[in-house]
Swiss-Prot record:
Family: Belongs to the cytochrome f family.
Membrane topology: Single-pass membrane protein
Subunit structure: The 4 large subunits of the cytochrome b6-f complex are cytochrome b6, subunit IV (17 kDa polypeptide, petD), cytochrome f and the Rieske protein, while the 4 small subunits are PetG, PetL, PetM and PetN. The complex functions as a dimer.
Organism encoding this protein: Lolium perenne (Perennial ryegrass)
Residue positions binding heme: Y36, C56, C59, H60
Gene Ontology CC terms: chloroplast thylakoid membrane
Gene from which the chain derives: petA
Protein name: Cytochrome f
Superkingdom of the organism of origin: Eukaryota
Residue ranges crossing the lipid bilayer per the database entry: 286-306
């Protein structure tokens, strides 16, 4: 009876341990897979520095263009679309984390004026939902609803990203005004070259950390290389580790200098930022403008009618 209880206890403990292990694995994998779009969120309170530079450029070193399109003016409490285009050659392949080649992903950050935010689902029209597709946007911070991030998402499908935006109503939001506002955007295609902790990814150039002669190049079992460099002056040996992905440019016996590239640059992507302006238009001002135009048109019509009437009178007097 005691052995049976012991067996049951051991079985229960093993089941609990396995369950905990599975939970830890799932949580770990989820955080790793989701880490990319929130790298900036984890390290920076605001994605736009005082200089105007968006912090994503700290990891994506290459510069590439982006294009942002928004309406010239919008009315209060109105849903409109901000369209971000991230152009690149769809035939390009990037180096993945495991060293293999794959398609490029894209990501973006949209910095809206205070009061502007992501439109709620019940305010988005079916036509706009079709343009958005399966994209899922999130706020940069819970208290920064005007800053939106997206990505990584497949570049072939989402090189054009449509953000559904809701404009504020100054009648209900005291910090909103009928003014012209700037909108800032940053977009990247492909993986970054530097991680937030400052370490290099495998999507960049690796340089020699010492001057000397390449004594040995060891190809690692899981990919990548270990390059042994011996300094001819003092015999000191340095080992530079190259992750899988970049292609070697040096060979054994070759003399190299400090900071000389050991690999090619595999990066085919890059980051770009842009800006646009939008006017939060006062409906009363629009109505006043329409009334003015209508008044001008009516005045012109009456003027034409009066002129024709005058011409008829003149013609009558001449005939008389």
């Amino acid at each position: 009876m005691e052995n049976k209880n012991t067996f049951s206890w051991v079985k229960e403990q093993m089941t609990r341990s396995i369950s905990v292990s599975i939970m830890i694995y799932v949580i770990t994998q989820t955080s790793i897979s989701n880490a990319y779009p929130i790298f900036a969120q984890q390290g920076y309170e605001n994605p736009r520095e005082a200089t105007g530079r968006i912090v994503c450029a700290n990891c994506h070193l290459a510069s590439k263009p982006v294009d942002i399109e928004v309406p010239q003016a919008v009315l209060p409490d109105t849903v409109f679309e901000a369209v971000l285009r991230i152009p690149y050659d769809m035939q390009l392949k990037q180096v993945l984390a495991n060293g293999k080649k794959g398609g490029l992903n894209v990501g973006a950050v949209l910095i809206l004026p205070e009061g502007f935010e992501l439109a709620p689902p019940d305010r988005i029209s079916p036509e706009l939902k079709e343009k958005i597709g399966n994209l899922s946007f999130q706020s940069y911070r819970p208290d920064k609803k005007n800053i939106l991030v997206i990505g990584p998402v497949p570049g072939k499908k989402y090189s054009e990203i449509v953000f559904p935006i809701l404009s504020p109503d100054p009648a209900t939001k005291k910090d909103a005004y009928f003014l012209k506002y700037p909108i800032y955007v940053g977009g990247n295609r492909g993986r970054g070259q530097i991680y937030p902790d400052g370490s290099k990814s495998n999507n960049t150039v690796y340089n020699a950390t010492s001057t000397g002669i390449v004594k040995k190049i060891l190809r690692k079992e899981k990919g990548g290389y270990e390059i042994s460099i011996v300094d001819a002056s003092d015999g000191r040996q340095v080992i530079d580790t190259i992750p899988p992905g970049p292609e070697l440019l040096v060979s054994e016996g070759e003399s190299i200098k400090l900071d000389q590239p050991l690999t090619s640059n595999p990066n085919v992507g890059g980051f770009g930022q842009g800006d646009a302006e939008i006017v939060l238009q006062d409906p009363l001002r629009v109505q006043g403008l329409l009334f003015f135009f209508a008044s001008v048109i009516l005045a012109q019509v009456f003027l034409v009618l009066k002129k024709k009437q005058f011409e008829k009178v003149q013609l009558y007097e001449m005939n008389f």
